[in-house]
């Protein structure tokens, strides 16, 4: 903090002088993309293919320093730039192979508090938010305290003493829960993840795991809440699923992944087919996103129908919370989605004195009955008329 710097180092293969100039000295050059093109026949999962992510550091830093030593080389090189007048290359001293990136953080202004990025807990929060599921460990030396060993023999007037020490701590989880097989995760683990991630106090009514390879490659972990949020039927409610690209968060709530009638669903989608710096405008036109949307729509519908058939009591509780949204979906857009949603609808049957589906009503119709009869009023009003009659 005193030096206003963030130092990030790896233990990779490093870069030569020529590679530093090519990869960092050329804006929008992507070594990752070149690597994928050179190995297009292999199944490679790699992020960062546009070459502009590195330069986003200038949003918080007024100078970047990169020191790298390539594998098999005896010399190290330093690349440095203020983001204005090119860059400078100089020989450097580095004992180990790999790369170190130093961000020289900007001084605070009246409108921006850049020193927040130097706070230890702030850095941990940023890593947990955006890179918790990157499959490689992100470690940081953290200052901690512990009690010193007690002397032996211990004096009568002994008072415990504490000392500070630093410990290398892995900040990210690395293995996303949604990439595990459902058989490898307990219900308690799913429930705990849901409540921690989405701030709910109750367990979800349904956990949906979806994994697809082919035209659309993605992993999804979805949750049907057991109760509706307090602001669900207000303009303040935001639908959407957390969208990740190869384990890196690119959007907290991607509304385009869910139709309005399933807006109550919460969850996460992780796809290898999306780039890290894709914009909201590009997402709306992205063909992969449309494929994922269609697949999730079908999956959610099937899971809700399975709940209806296999756990009727739980489905009726779900219907009390979100049935209005399903009915609105069947009615809206001139009934465009009625065919998809009709098997999920429940109605109160005056004769049966319980909730029934349309199919259940039809199955019990007398042979001579040709129509479904209904009263377009609330059950309370209907009971009032029955009493008068």
Language-model features, listed with the residues they occupy:
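GHKL (Bergerat-fold) ATPase N-terminal catalytic module, capturing the glycine-rich phosphate-binding loop
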Residues: 1-3, 7-117, 125, 148
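Conserved small/polar residues in nucleotide/adenosyl-binding loops
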Residues: 2-8, 380-387
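GHKL/Bergerat-fold ATPase module in large chromosome/replication-associated machines
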Residues: 46, 64-86, 106-116, 121-383, ...
